[in-house]
Amino acid sequence: MRLGRVCPRGPGKVRSPRHRFSCTLFVSTTGSSCGHHGPQLAASSNPSVLPGLHEQPPQASHSRPLNGLLRLGIPGDMYARSEPFAPGPMARSDTLATATALHGYGGMNLTMNLTAPHGPGAFFRYMRQPIKQELICKWLGDDSPMSPRPCSKTFSTMHELVTHVTVEHVGGPEQANHICFWEECPRQGKPFKAKYKLVNHIRVHTGEKPFPCPFPGCGKVFARSENLKIHKRTHTGEKPFRCEFEGCERRFANSSDRKKHSHVHTSDKPYMCKVRGCDKCYTHPSSLRKHMKVHGRSPPPSSGYDSAITSALASPSLESGREPSVACSAAVVVRGTDVSE
């Protein structure tokens, strides 16, 4: 069964503003047991079949009966899809056939009340309304130390949730212990040394990101001001971190990139291929990513602005169970030049 709309418009007629919204919702009954082309439902069908759905402006009453169409008088906001129908009127008294034809479409729930007090189309206007977002506070209360229950208060905006957590749960400067009691927090009661660190941590649970990038068209937002500061350097080109090795003039936007670069000047090659039988290792993760294309794989993603030297890359291969090869420990020092493969 298909839904769509048709707008009766004769040749040379101009639709008025009211007539523009008198489009007809039709129900295609092709393939039903009531005939080759389905039941023929005229515009004048008995309103008792679908109460309240036959209220139409006077302009629509002059249109001729439509084969296979059911006039519902709903404003034309629905997607229209045309389908050929065989001609042929239907008697006004054929209400029983109409009810029988609609009996098999219980899943469509065509007899729902779409009328008063808002008139036709109120149901579809309601369905188009955006779903309101509910933010729930999951801070565990201290009313029952043995089995604490979450606060469970709901809020419609992030600002309301953050204000509630800050005022009602985190407390002011008089708070001695800076502990996160959010439900299922992985810190498990381990305190922070300062309140601002607790506030930054709570954003992991609430999803708050109060630091937007000020550059037009960027649109990125961050939970911490430090991350925003680092990000803005991608727009300004600032590189305040200079390589600490003498004779190297390389500069970087953040300290983690400088740390990754420093392996060029040492014997350390912590980025090791974990494919069984491969002994390649590199001084920089970008070199490892290029190498992994040979195997048709991708290494684990880096951790953003944090240190990219992860235990997964620095440790021996878990697949092969082998130790780092001698080549990974060999000292290759060429100042100012990237010698990674």
Curated annotation (Swiss-Prot):
Which SMART domains does the record match to this protein?
ZnF_C2H2 (SM00355)
Q: In which tissues is it expressed?
A: Exclusively expressed in the cerebellum.
Similarity comment: family membership = Belongs to the GLI C2H2-type zinc-finger protein family.
**Which stretches are zinc fingers (C2H2-type)?**
135-169, 178-205, 211-235, 241-265, 271-295
SUPFAM superfamilies to which the protein is assigned, alphabetical: beta-beta-alpha zinc fingers
Q: Report the protein's function.
A: Binds to DNA.
Q: What Gene3D superfamilies does the entry give?
A: Classic Zinc Finger
* InterPro entries from the UniProt entry: GLI-like (IPR043359), Znf-C2H2_ZIC1-5/GLI1-3-like (IPR056436), Znf_C2H2_sf (IPR036236), Znf_C2H2_type (IPR013087), Znf_ZIC (IPR041643)
Q: Which UniProt keywords apply?
A: DNA-binding, Metal-binding, Nucleus, Repeat, Zinc, Zinc-finger
Q: Name one Pfam family in it.
A: zf_ZIC
GO cellular component, as recorded? nucleus
Upper lineage is: Eukaryota, Metazoa, Chordata, Craniata, Vertebrata
Record GO biological process: regulation of transcription by RNA polymerase II
Q: Where is the segment annotated Disordered?
A: 36-66, 289-309
In terms of PANTHER family, this protein maps to: GLIS FAMILY ZINC FINGER 2, TRANSCRIPTIONAL ACTIVATOR CUBITUS INTERRUPTUS
Q: What name goes with this protein?
A: Zinc finger protein ZIC 4
Q: Does the keyword Endoplasmic reticulum apply?
A: no
The protein's location, in the record's own words, is: Nucleus
